[in-house]
């Protein structure tokens, strides 16, 4: 069965997307091309392979989860790195714990097999940077003071021609109470 690569992400607002785009362009002027330079700002929840049939099933599940999610005021006030060369904007601890809970709910609901699951919400500026480029990134930027209201998850499909993900669905947080499915029994 044919499958595509998909990415489920928390999507910042247009203002933050533009601010991060400017940061990525500034970094590119200093270090040249790098992984994630052209990607739209996002916080990855999971990446996975799926068929169109799988996506149709997941669409309703994601929608149902997001209808119960409450928007989260998210602050990005420091940079961080991972050993794999990722340079990122760190999510504040209060928002991070809420976004982790939302991601866990999605993992439990979707039951994604063989998926990359992000367990530490962050907003990547660059990936696969060597130590020198990492130091240049730290030197370039002052301490960030960015924020956005996280109120949307997007589903993205990898566009093989552009080698970038394209957004194919939006799932707004609706702050509605969720009725858990209950099983009725006859005695």
Locate each region found by the language model.
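Basic, often amphipathic N-terminal segments
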Residues: 1-71, 93-149, 165-187
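Short proline/glycine- and acidic-rich turn/helix-capping motifs at secondary-structure junctions
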Residues: 77-84, 121, 154-164
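Charge-rich, low-complexity N-terminal segments
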Residues: 86-91
């Amino acid at each position: 069965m044919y499958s595509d690569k998909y990415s489920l992400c928390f999507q910042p607002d247009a203002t933050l997307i533009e601010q991060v785009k400017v940061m990525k362009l500034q970094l590119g002027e200093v270090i040249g091309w790098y992984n994630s330079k052209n990607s739209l700002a996002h916080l990855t929840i999971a990446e996975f392979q799926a068929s169109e049939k799988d996506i149709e099933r997941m669409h309703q599940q994601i929608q149902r989860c997001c209808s119960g999610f409450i928007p989260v005021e998210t602050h990005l006030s420091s940079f961080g790195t991972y050993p794999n060369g990722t340079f990122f904007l760190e999510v504040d601890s209060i928002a991070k714990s809420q976004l982790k809970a939302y991601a866990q709910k999605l993992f439990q609901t979707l039951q994604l097999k063989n998926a990359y699951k992000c367990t530490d919400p962050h907003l990547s500026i660059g990936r696969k940077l060597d130590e020198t480029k990492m130091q240049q990134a730290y030197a370039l930027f002052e301490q960030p003071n960015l924020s956005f209201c996280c109120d949307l998850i997007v589903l993205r499909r990898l566009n093989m021609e552009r080698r970038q993900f394209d957004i194919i669905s939006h799932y707004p947080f609706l702050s509605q109470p969720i009725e858990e499915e209950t099983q009725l029994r006859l005695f």
